[in-house]
């Protein structure tokens, strides 16, 4: 039974590894929205409770998020499919961080994680969270060809072959791998509803609800094509330790599901209520980085 409480971990549960693979992909999503001044109008560099520095890390050359240019990405035939193996029983709790809602996992063993693709080692799952906007016109951190999605999912993993814990991996070279998944409005998402149903219990900052087994691979798109590039965390400490893996195709969620995200608060109990929206970082310059794709990009003028 789910119960709301202040910060703390839930009980341990036995392991049960689940693996998922997806079918062939469409060439290009057919649902683009253009937001002219997304970064300029909706900058929120002061939103994060730990944010005391500038929008960009001082001297940083590999900051995230970025605008992914479809035709400028470079196809890399050496990029294998990403291997995903998440243990549903390692899910611990969902909490309101004061910046977004986040689902935490037991990362003390190797059962939940990813490997393959652009990664040289196994990376353990630590947590996942979402970013979203005040309206359905924007909310994602990354853009594709200048187009924003209403929301973006981030699954955060750390290099357990190179570092002894998540904290050390956060600021270490090749320390983190983050999967990015865009959300678009469409059909009701059955698996996401499990999270949506308990959001009212974590409306305020620093509240938590214990969860039973949950396999986050149910939130991945069927198509596993992706872009990858070297980047950073999008919240403090903005460490440039991240291998980003951004899925080409989004998942569909219903308008009512996304609206429930916007019922959460940045504020804690007893504080003036401040609605949790626009919890994304503005776009950062590419600065000569290569964005590689696991799929071939059709040339202009060719049929998909």
Curated annotation (Swiss-Prot):
Where along the chain is Zn(2+) bound?
A: 129, 131, 154
MF term (GO), any? zinc ion binding
- Return the EC number: 4.2.1.1
Where does it live in the cell? Mitochondrion
Tissue specificity is:
High in liver, also detected in heart, lung, kidney, spleen and intestine.
Q: What class of enzyme is it?
A: lyase
What are the protein's UniProt keywords? Lyase, Metal-binding, Mitochondrion, Transit peptide, Zinc
Annotated SMART domains: Carb_anhydrase
Ranges of residues in domain Alpha-carbonic anhydrase? 35-295
Q: Which Gene3D superfamilies match?
A: Alpha carbonic anhydrase
Its cofactor is:
Zn(2+)
Q: What is this protein called?
A: Carbonic anhydrase 5A, mitochondrial
Taxonomic source organism: Rattus norvegicus
């Amino acid at each position: 039974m789910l119960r709301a409480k202040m910060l703390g971990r839930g009980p341990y549960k036995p392991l049960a590894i689940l693996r998922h693979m997806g079918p062939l992909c469409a060439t290009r999503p057919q649902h683009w929205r253009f937001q002219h001044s997304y970064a300029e109008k909706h900058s929120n560099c002061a939103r994060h409770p730990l944010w005391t520095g500038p929008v960009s890390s001082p001297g940083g050359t590999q900051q995230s998020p970025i605008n992914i240019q479809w035709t400028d990405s470079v196809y890399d035939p050496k990029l294998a499919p990403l291997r995903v193996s998440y243990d549903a029983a390692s899910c611990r709790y969902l909490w309101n961080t004061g910046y977004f809602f986040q689902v935490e996992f037991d990362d003390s063993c190797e059962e939940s994680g990813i490997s393959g693709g652009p990664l040289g080692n196994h990376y353990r799952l630590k947590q996942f969270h979402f970013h979203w906007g005040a309206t359905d016109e924007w909310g994602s951190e990354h853009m594709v060809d200048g187009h924003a999605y209403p929301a973006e999912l981030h699954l955060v993993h750390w290099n357990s072959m190179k570092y002894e814990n998540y904290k050390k991996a956060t600021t270490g070279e090749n320390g983190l791998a983050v999967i990015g998944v865009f959300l678009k409005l469409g059909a009701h998402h059955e698996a996401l509803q499990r999270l949506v149903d308990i959001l009212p219990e974590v409306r305020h900052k620093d509240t938590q609800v214990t969860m039973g087994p949950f396999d986050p691979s149910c939130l991945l798109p069927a198509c596993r094509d992706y872009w990858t590039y070297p980047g950073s965390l999008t919240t403090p400490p903005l460490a440039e330790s991240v291998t980003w893996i951004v899925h080409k195709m989004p998942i569909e969620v219903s308008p009512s599901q996304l609206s429930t995200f916007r019922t959460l608060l940045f504020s804690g109990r007893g504080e003036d209520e401040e609605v949790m929206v626009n919890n994304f970082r503005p776009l950062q310059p590419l600065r000569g980085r290569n964005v590689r794709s696991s799929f071939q990009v059709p040339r202009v003028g060719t049929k998909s």
